[in-house]
Design a protein with these regions (language model features):
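AMP-binding/adenylate-forming catalytic core of the ANL superfamily
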Residues: 137, 143, 150, 165-250
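Gly/Ser/Thr-rich phosphate-binding loop
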Residues: 34-38, 50-111
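AMP-binding/adenylate-forming catalytic domain of the ANL superfamily
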Residues: 246-269
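Beta-strand->loop->alpha-helix junctions that form or flank phosphate-binding loops
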Residues: 89-97, 115-119, 212-214, 256
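Conserved AMP-binding/adenylation subdomain of ANL enzymes
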Residues: 1-35
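Glycine-centered tight turns that cap/initiate beta-strands
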Residues: 61, 86, 122, 205-208, ...
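Conserved ATP/PPi-binding loop(s) of AMP-dependent carboxylate-activating enzymes
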Residues: 118-122, 126-154, 189-191
């Protein structure tokens, strides 16, 4: 992402995440023209939670925001569209192994959850029999340095098969459903935790959450929802809300309040720490 900006004579300002939100707005203030930025979903949630009004004041100066690296909830997508009605807001599918494969402007009047758009001109994608996303194109890596064994696990015949579960909709857009290694098996049902999390995050009393597998003394493995509560959090109301939005086997049995959700350096939920 750095090279194209420098190639066309643009300026890049690097900031150390959103440890200080004021630094983010200061960087925009110092730019003589409109700006574009990449923000992981966790950073977007921070801006919406703590600086929504201020962000709206910068609407005319933000050309576009690109997000990726982790799933963004539809609730956050809708809020961002409301705050920045004229800005382009892109949800991008990319990785170190594949480069940028597709992107989707969800501020075009049709805000679709989990949608990552149609393939770029230099790329293509397909879905394997196992439901995994496969990628082809000029931006694929040639392999891991000095590690052909690991390379062969995900790359064959100039094709990278990811661990992402997804499908291609009627418009030819890629729709992600979660990670294959994150799927939770409950009574034979394979459940993507992101689906439960996205619905829960649309409940007004929740700041953040993570859905995990837990052991129940009677019915073995069940879903457990760890919740970072907001000011108006009510567990009974949350359960009723989830029951109105999800199928019965996707309703968490156990609930626990926590101070924060463990995340990786790039804003993804650190699911390994909950296993």
């Amino acid at each position: 992402k750095i090279y194209p900006v420098l190639y066309v004579g643009g300026t890049i300002r690097l900031i150390d995440g959103l440890k200080d939100i004021n630094v983010f707005f200061q960087a925009i203030d110092e730019a003589p023209f409109k700006v574009a930025t990449f923000l992981v979903p966790d950073s977007i949630r921070m801006l919406l939670s703590f600086a929504k009004s201020k962000l709206s004041e910068y609407a005319s100066k933000i050309d576009f925001i690109e997000t990726g690296a982790a799933p963004i909830s539809q609730e956050d997508m809708l809020q961002l569209c409301h705050v920045l009605p004229q800005s382009r807001l892109y949800n991008t599918y990319a990785s170190t192994e594949t480069g940028i494969v597709s992107t989707y402007n969800f501020n075009n009047g049709n805000c679709l959850s989990g949608c990552l758009g149609q393939p770029m001109k230099h790329s293509s994608f397909f879905i394997t029999e196992e439901g995994l996303v496969g990628c082809k194109g000029k931006t694929l890596m040639s392999g891991y340095w000095n590690d052909m064994k690991t390379t062969d696990l995900i790359m064959q015949n100039d094709t990278v098969v990811t661990a992402d579960l997804g499908y291609i909709d009627e418009q030819g857009c890629l729709r992600l459903q979660g990670r294959n290694d994150d799927i939770i098996n409950i009574g034979g049902y394979k459940i993507a935790p992101t689906e439960i999390e996205n619905v829960a995050l649309s409940f007004p009393g929740i700041k953040d959450c993570v859905c995990i597998a837990a052991v129940h003394p009677v019915i073995n493995q069940v879903l457990k929802l760890l919740v970072v509560p907001g000011m108006n959090y009510n567990r009974k109301e949350l359960v009723s809300f989830l029951k109105s939005k999800l199928e019965a086997h996707k309703i968490p049995i156990l609930y626990e309040e926590i101070e924060k959700v463990q995340r990786t350096f790039n804003g993804k939920i650190d699911r390994k720490s909950y296993r």
